[in-house]
Amino acid sequence: MENFKHLPEPFRIRVIEPVKRTTRAYREEAIIKSGMNPFLLDSEDVFIDLLTDSGTGAVTQSMQAAMMRGDEAYSGSRSYYALAESVKNIFGYQYTIPTHQGRGAEQIYIPVLIKKREQEKGLDRSKMVAFSNYFFDTTQGHSQINGCTVRNVYIKEAFDTGVRYDFKGNFDLEGLERGIEEVGPNNVPYIVATITSNSAGGQPVSLANLKVMYSIAKKYDIPVVMDSARFAENAYFIKQREAEYKDWTIEQITRETYKYADMLAMSAKKDAMVPMGGLLCMKDDSFFDVYTECRTLCVVQEGFPTYGGLEGGAMERLAVGLYDGMNLDWLAYRIAQVQYLVDGLEEIGVVCQQAGGHAAFVDAGKLLPHIPADQFPAQALACELYKVAGIRAVEIGSFLLGRDPKTGKQLPCPAELLRLTIPRATYTQTHMDFIIEAFKHVKENAANIKGLTFTYEPKVLRHFTAKLKEV
């Protein structure tokens, strides 16, 4: 099969979910009712749902079977120990706290690391800054509600949709060290390495870059947290693009990657393929004090530390999903599906970020140059795409980035992108062709698409629940 141009999906579809078709008039009414915010649409009114790949895909038969082994004991569940063993074997991390999803881990570890830095290094809360190659929205939100400013230090190629570069998710290493020196190392409670970099377009981070980042962190004794939602996709890109690792397995690359962090926080709803679940893990005894504090907070915020908001069956499913998500054939198919969509869009003149791991990112700023950033061109494009074809996508731009919590001013965004997120093992190549055709219709009417302004704006993570109207 090596000589075929396109290979079919490497799985058989056994269970299907019917979806309904709607009219243009129905969809126009629905998107207005939602406040021009696709997050607020009812899922039954969506024909193809590209909002997120978080918990929205299929699961494997081995994952589903594993649920039957679930031990629902409140404490000391054997399902917890099965999950902790998977974490040790895959990542090499000794201490595991399950959470209901990624933000459950964030709400625990962020205040603990801030407190630790304050007690041990004299951190000044009025001056503290955390760094990342690019913070995911909830990580940024949890940092900000704990009073911590966030700073993204990414390479110049990251958001340039006209440039092809193997590792657009990389840290700007000089910018990282310069920033640490500027704010003072003692005022940096943590560094977050996001793999892959979602906001940059699902772009990978190289192992070489992670190694240097970690050496900088160790120089200043700053803890590193690996934001691990798409750890397997990142490992696949390393295998494909970093020559030193071309003969390594995904498992070997993953184990090597996690040497260059002290903790991991994971939304397991992505590469671990579960509908619900997350992880917070510490590498070794040097972070046992953090583990102890996080366990205490887990009881209050998530549940007892041996279930963390998950039923026993869900922990068993996650223990298997961590392995299933690293299957090489599976990863090759998934990355190829995204590449197919990006290639098809660019063939019709729709500019995209280079294909990443989990989504096609359309450059809405270039498709809708008449709409200024403060009128959210990618959000306007999302609404038009829904009207035209019933496709739900998500804005990754100024609308998501939000305002500076200290000044209230809109934060400058490096690109206005529309993310077409592909759920795992859910849509076929025919769906990709339909999406491409939908963009032909959107492109024909692009000049008539209007910008948006707020009718309701939450102060934190506004993109989830805000309401807007056309200007």
From Swiss-Prot:
Enzyme Commission number(s) of this protein: 4.1.99.1
Coiled-coil blocks: none
Residues carrying N6-acetyllysine: 5, 115, 156, 450
Recorded catalytic activity of this chain's protein: L-tryptophan + H2O = indole + pyruvate + NH4(+)
One Pfam family cited in the UniProt record for this chain: Beta_elim_lyase
PROSITE patterns for the chain: BETA_ELIM_LYASE
Any one GO molecular-function label of the UniProt entry: tryptophanase activity
Matching NCBIfam families: PRK13238.1, tnaA_trp_ase
Record's protein name: Tryptophanase
Provenance organism: Escherichia coli O6:H1 (strain CFT073 / ATCC 700928 / UPEC)
